[in-house]
Amino acid sequence: MDGRVGLRASRRAAPTPRVAVRSSPRHRARVREQEPVVSAMSGSGLGKENKAGSSTPLRHRPNAFSELDNATPRVMLRKIIQNQPQVSPLALQTVQLEETEDARPEPPSQRTSSTVELQLPDLVPEDASVTTFRMTRKRKKLSISEFERAADKRLPQNQAHSTLDSTLVRSLRMSVGSVMAPDTVEKRGLLRRPQNHKAIDIAAFEGGVEQNMLQIKAQDYLVDLQTSSMTGTTTIRTDAEVVLNNTELFVEPQLGEQNLLAVEPQLSDSKTSAQRSNTSYPAHEKARLEGLVSRVSTDERRTLRFSEKDLITDHEHVDGITQKTPAKQGEEEQDHSQQNDPMEQFSESEEMAGTTEHHADAEYSEHSEKKLSRKAVSQLTAAQDAGVEMEMTPSEGGVAEGTEHQDSPKAELQMAGSPGGHSPASYSLEKPGAKPLKEAVEQTGEIERGTITGVLDAAEEEATDDESDKEDHESEEISMKTPMFVHAAAYRPQPVLSPPHPVKSASPELPPQPVRAKPVPKSSGAAQRKTREPEIASSLIKQIFSHYVKTPVTRDAYKIVEKCSERYFKQISSDLEAYSQHAGRKTVEMADVELLMRRQGLVTDKMPLHVLVERHLPLEYRKLLIPIAVSGNKVIPCK
């Protein structure tokens, strides 16, 4: 009972929403209006009402309370929801708007004139309820070309072209609802930078092309100079190479008077190129060779001053020589050169120098240089053959001696390449009275072409004899027999590749001294001892151990202590090495030792390393390990 009373009291104290609605004056008015209806329905049983008056209103109260329940906010909200039409969120329904006024079709002329208010005909206005569900969908993009096509279809064919042509500019500006604005307006940071195309200037382009051509020409000129200098330094080492370089594939036609005048500028160019190639020689050699060149030029002038009668006799002598066989010509030339013809040797050296000059200037004019060199050589040889019949003057003998005793092969090349060696002959041939001399020169050139092979064969045999014989007098005879142009080919300057063959000295070679045996070093006894591992001195271990024991110790005990200390220090060294390697160092530092002693338990926060050293080690070791203050305001060890 007490529980029920308490429950009722709690209900009264905190009324529910239903009780609050019932207690409202509006609810009471509704109950009063419904009481007559209830009494009419229960008019038949009045007697029963008296008997159980308290029960009848209780029977009809549920109907009244059911009506009252319908008035709650929940029921009212439910009824509102039930009265509303059912709309599914998935299946969208388009709302059809009733058109109050029928849209009258406008003529196309009026519709095209109002381009600002023109809208798309196919688009249907959407309801707000529908657009809420279409927020995530993208609008359909419509291009202007499609819009124009649709407009053309709806317009009559007669007015389509005229109206669209007149309103083409305005149609591009009209506002179409479905056309999206370009993204470039909103996101200007994403715009691509316009490419700046530089305008090409024709004058600048042509100037650049000309500069490139000039650079290419300059590079080609430098390459030509380098190749010409390299060809000038190449050497002909063997006699076979000399023969190959002097051979010809065909007999060239003889030069006439007209060709001489046409070839003169080429000769001057070849002379200048030869002068350029000769500038690389040292200055002191040039000074020594200039005297020889002047002597040779004076002798050539003397030989060219002979009369025409002498030249005719020489010409007859040359005709007699041509009837001989090549073998006899080779033998006669060998005998003639051995006896008294050093000038012919000089002419042959001149011929060889002309061929070398041709190799040096091959990059500039190959074919013209061959003709010029052969012409100059034939001129000199003709003049010298004419002078062979005459008696040799002292000056000619001096020239022969100069040509025989030249120390360096550079002198012969300098004489061949200098303008003084060929200028008198070339100038004297241009005179009107020198026609017989020209004919003699041409014939002597043909003779030398046929006889040079025999001379070279003899030179090869003599070269082999020179290699086999080592005595000095035999080498001198062989050098006299061999022609000068073979020596010039063998002793050409070799500044880069290989040095020239040295001339043998007249002094006899000394026998080699016997090599003395080196004294064997005496082996010391300390070196024969086996190397031992580093270890602590036994005296130090005894001293430290006796310091702490302070009692007499036997020898066996010291041995055991030494073994223990050795093992202990080996283990310490391995641990310290591991610590240093782990730290990335190759040296053991104080921090590694302190870390090891801390792990062993010797060093702690209460017992630092310095205190431990001061307690257990004597003064001499303390001075080495930790700083100690001494008299005189000094600290040991000094840091």
From Swiss-Prot:
Compositional bias (Low complexity): 12-23
Organism field: Gallus gallus (Chicken)
Skewed-composition ranges (Acidic residues): 458-469
Recorded superkingdom: Eukaryota
Stated role: Component of the CENPA-NAC (nucleosome-associated) complex, a complex that plays a central role in assembly of kinetochore proteins, mitotic progression and chromosome segregation. The CENPA-NAC complex recruits the CENPA-CAD (nucleosome distal) complex and may be involved in incorporation of newly synthesized CENPA into centromeres. Part of a nucleosome-associated complex that binds specifically to histone H3-containing nucleosomes at the centromere, as opposed to nucleosomes containing CENPA.
Quaternary organization: Component of the CENPA-CAD complex, composed of CENPI, CENPK, CENPL, CENPO, CENPP, CENPQ, CENPR and CENPS. The CENPA-CAD complex is probably recruited on centromeres by the CENPA-NAC complex, at least composed of CENPA, CENPC, CENPH, CENPM, CENPN, CENPT and CENPU. Identified in a centromeric complex containing histones H2A, H2B, H3 and H4, and at least CENPA, CENPB, CENPC, CENPT, CENPN, HJURP, SUPT16H, SSRP1 and RSF1. Interacts (via N-terminus) with the NDC80 complex.
Protein name, entry field: Centromere protein T
Gene Ontology biological-process annotations: cell division; chromosome segregation; kinetochore assembly; mitotic cell cycle
SUPFAM superfamilies: Histone-fold
Pfam families, alphabetized: CENP-T_C (PF15511), CENP-T_N (PF16171)
Region (Flexible stalk domain): 80-500
Molecular function as annotated in GO: DNA binding; protein heterodimerization activity
Miscellaneous comment as given in the Swiss-Prot or TrEMBL entry: Association with CENPA-containing complexes may be indirect and due to the proximity of centromeric nucleosomes containing histone H3 with those containing CENPA.
Main subcellular localisation: nucleus
Protein localization: Nucleus; Chromosome, Centromere; Chromosome, Centromere, Kinetochore
UniProtKB keywords: Cell cycle, Cell division, Centromere, Chromosome, DNA-binding, Kinetochore, Mitosis, Nucleus
Gene3D superfamilies hit by this protein: Histone, subunit A
